[in-house]
């Protein structure tokens, strides 16, 4: 298998596993929303936000391990790679226990209005189990065992969906949290018995400091991205309460699923981008990755965004009518995900060209813009749609700054920049026109489930018919002289640095 097909295969593993896992989580989210109600579902989303931030208690050691252990494996320093993984496991576990202890201390403060304290005790337990699971995934990726990593992700999603929904049905949110902890333990056991993947703890202060120094800037960037995707929900939780959060956050299960494909592609593509740019020593390679990659990815995602926009109202209308207010903001954010998708390749190229600080600044600017926009929307009583527009402004800000910086670093001349941005803008305009036209041409049928399903299918078919020629053309172009060809090894007879 040549390098290009190897990269595509690895991307396929990562993307397929993420979509299968997120599809199961969508089922889980719908089940939880139904059995817990808006207030209970809002409480779980508040806890989930806390869990996301607690996932970075290791201060970047996982990211540092992913970089250094991968290099050690590539140079056949297996013992050193294992020691690095063991050190990262120790830092990860100590950080998780420290955060869990902090949560336990906070909930023990008398008079603190946090509701059922035992739920937060369970959350503290989830911090430890979740963080060790995240370490396990990073450890597998450092060994390039993408297939096994993907299989375990699907297993965890399957267990947490089945047992989690049953737990919520029987015992409410407490049952769901207990089931989630059990699922992590079952996943660990499976990993240990079938793959030999169980963390071997190593105490090495020097290596721990090295891993943290390497991974901390990466962690800050990831933390800013998490904050950007959650700043709207955090402000809704603080300013409007958990009931409003439960209604607003339901749509995030769809938007999160959409973002998994470019995230999976970026995760696999980044090391190959670095290698390709480093080998070629040519600025033309950077330009090719940036422009051709963004064009291909945005073309591929447009039909997915269109289908998600048109399908979103269907399950909410018939399965979760209490959450009907989440439809419009959800559709706004589905369209808004076009911006970070288009900027995915730009981010990888920017980091490969030494622009990590610029990317951090872009993320920080996106968080600030989103925070201001959402805060003003809530204070002015603008409703959920205005809140979603504020969040969308943050996504556009980050994507715009990172893309502009990547174009500068890659040395794109002004005509090329204008043409590149114009293509992306026209593609987004076409996406908006297509979904609006399909919704107008084929109206919904809220009185009949069967007819509503048929009409939704027809709307999606019309949208796909519009995007099909462009997708086919992009794929043929990629097969003929694909942008991933730049990642081929030097000396390959088909390599071109023109």
Please state what every model-predicted region is.
Residues 1-26, 78-82, 86, 205-221, ...:
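N-terminal membrane topogenesis motif
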Residues 1-7, 121, 147, 151, ...:
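Interhelical loop/hinge segments that connect adjacent transmembrane helices in multipass membrane
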Residues 3, 107-123, 291, 309-338, ...:
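Interfacial segments at transmembrane-helix termini and the short loops linking adjacent helices
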Residues 9-26, 156, 176-187, 191, ...:
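Transmembrane helical elements of multi-pass membrane transporters/channels
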Residues 59-75, 142, 251, 255-294, ...:
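Helix-loop junctions and terminal segments of transmembrane helices
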Residues 120-121, 150-197, 214, 364-372, ...:
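Hydrophobic alpha-helical transmembrane segments
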Residues 121, 156, 170, 365-369, ...:
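Transmembrane alpha-helical segments of multi-pass transport proteins
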Residues 128-151, 199, 334-365:
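Membrane-interface junctions at transmembrane-helix termini in multi-pass inner-membrane proteins
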